[in-house]
Swiss-Prot record:
It comes from the Eukaryota. The keyword Amino-acid biosynthesis does not apply. This is Oil body-associated protein 1A. Its main location: other. GO terms for cellular component: lipid droplet. Belongs to the OBAP family. It is found in: Lipid droplet. Expressed in seeds, but not in leaves or roots. Highest expression in scutellum. Detected in embryo axis and endosperm. InterPro entries: OBAP-like (IPR010686). Keywords: Lipid droplet, Lipoprotein. It comes from Zea mays (Maize).
Length: 238
């Protein structure tokens, strides 16, 4: 299986035989219902909401909670050793429009990603892929990354980061595009042509989505805890 276009060495010793045997036993005994609901693998690109130049390959493994809401685990690659770097929630336009206006800038659209050919389902025949992407094209997503693999972090360091997606031509780094196209044997240009008929949200892209065209940065600050909250703790970070 192809690996990520951004690779770093993770600290720690190789998994021991005893650990592997224990995992085999627990894997047989226990159920993993939430994970067994994953039905879809989407590959796309994310950039940090405060720095479009920092772009990463993002593999989404998604499950439907219902027809209007999907939840996705995001890995840096499709292989067994891929790192869990974030999560994304995908909602229909109907659900997005119910969100408070203060919340909407944290969400992004998928129309350009889909119609631009840069969001795809590895290994899935085009006819099947396009049937689902017709729906994805109309949705909104909220993405948070915990592991900044693009800067070479060996572990998830620092604050969670709000991520955004491509919204027009010329934003995707060519080296990253070339790497992914070669690795998965896809052509973004060909897919762009195949998806020209698709349409985005029925009411158009909401003006508050995509961070309203501005940058968003996650920050942390120290505040005092209310006296009634706890007797032992005097500080909290938000």
């Amino acid at each position: 299986m192809a690996s990520s276009c951004q690779n770093v060495e993770i600290p720690g010793k190789p998994t021991e035989t005893g650990t592997a045997l224990l995992e085999t036993a627990t894997g047989t005994i226990q159920g993993f219902a939430p994970l067994s609901q994953i039905h879809q693998h989407l590959c796309a690109f994310h950039f940090y909401a405060d720095d479009m130049g920092r772009q990463v390959e993002a593999h989404h493994f998604c499950a439907h909670l219902n027809e209007d809401v999907r939840q996705c685990l995001i890995f840096d690659g499709p292989g067994a050793g891929a790192r869990l770097i974030g999560v994304e929630y995908i909602v229909s336009e109907t659900v997005f429009l119910t969100l408070p206006d203060a919340e909407k800038p944290l969400w992004h659209t998928h129309e350009f990603e889909v119609k631009g050919g840069v969001l795809f389902m590895p290994g899935v025949p085009g006819v099947v892929e396009r049937r689902d992407l017709e729906k994805v094209c109309k949705t909104y997503g909220k993405t948070i990354h915990f592991w900044q693999v693009d800067r070479g972090d060996a572990l998830p360091l620092g604050l969670p980061q709000i991520m955004m997606v491509l919204t027009r031509e010329g934003q995707l780094r060519q080296d990253l595009a070339d790497c992914v196209e070669k690795k998965f044997g896809v052509s973004f240009q060909k897919e762009r042509e195949n998806r020209a008929y698709m349409s985005g949200p029925e009411h158009g892209i909401h003006p508050l989505a995509n961070a309203t065209g501005k940058g968003l940065r996650t920050e942390i600050r120290e505040v005092d805890l209310p006296a009634s909250t706890t007797a032992g703790a005097g500080r909290v970070f938000t």
